[in-house]
């Protein structure tokens, strides 16, 4: 097994990412119930060494998934390069990899390129779910509340100091320093950035005004590459703030803001429970086995205690591969991922895929040829 980040061997972080999957049923509703035992059938065979790349948010989960694949199918493996969602889609469409990992589903233009690459429709299969943390480094500030509008104003430069009245109003009684805010953003094409900006666009009630996309549009701050790059920048910079996939924030022991949502006045911290409540409201907007999620319900939840900044990581696959040996192996890898790959995830801070969604996801996986 090889797990690569930016072409180098991935050093797996000791703290696990939160993997929440509970967003599908026969009626396009979502469920967040507990998963049952992982005994899914794996039909091994095909290409011996698969190659994939993309999302850094799923890099930690991939460790367990690749191990499960190697155990289920001796002599087969997957080499995964965690180089960002944009690269994952580009390399998949360029036939450099066998599938891509992306924190955003394919855009219309990417669908066309993927169909040309595959010679068949491409499918977005959501396998990993995780929250995005707003992390910060301010000496003496161990707790911080933000809402969508205030976060948007920080990340587009409308708020520039930590003791701004807008921040102070959300943190009564907290001594906020009169020091400048240093915004750090992802400077690579990133599904994490896309999802974070979608949250700002939806939850800020017009305060963001920059739109979304895989490149950061805030117009302020300093760039860093990948979740690990932004995490390192925050640790090194007093007065800084950024957005990270949760496992990186945990691994680097970064301070994480609590988020006030449209569902109630209480600020909500990231937890399995708070993210599970959010995912329970997800709907599938894709057709057939293309399991694209409608995530707008994440960003403005109606249930109190829901953490709103959540992304889904998709595996971008061909429905019918030009080389059937590749299709067989990709199917086997994903079968082991939703099967034995789920075992023990909770021990490392992961949440297994609930049965309600696993059955729908498995049906799509089994249809890959």
From Swiss-Prot:
GO molecular function, a single term: phosphate ion binding
Main location: membrane
Residue numbers with lipid attached (N-palmitoyl cysteine): 23
Disulfide partners: none
SUPFAM superfamilies registered for this protein in UniProt: Periplasmic binding protein-like II
Membrane topology field: Lipid-anchor
Signal peptide: 1-22
Binding site for phosphate: 55-57, 85, 103, 190-192
Compartments reported by the entry: Cell membrane
Domain of life: Bacteria
Lipidation (S-diacylglycerol cysteine): 23
Single biological process term from Gene Ontology: phosphate ion transmembrane transport
Gene Ontology CC annotations of this record: ATP-binding cassette (ABC) transporter complex
Keywords of this entry: Cell membrane, Lipoprotein, Membrane, Palmitate, Phosphate transport, Signal, Transport
A Pfam family that the UniProt record links to this protein: PBP_like_2
Function summary: Part of the ABC transporter complex PstSACB involved in phosphate import.
UniProt subunit comment: The complex is composed of two ATP-binding proteins (PstB), two transmembrane proteins (PstC and PstA) and a solute-binding protein (PstS).
The family this protein is said to belong to: Belongs to the PstS family.
UniProt name for this protein: Phosphate-binding protein PstS 3
Species for this entry: Mycobacterium avium
Gene behind this protein: pstS3
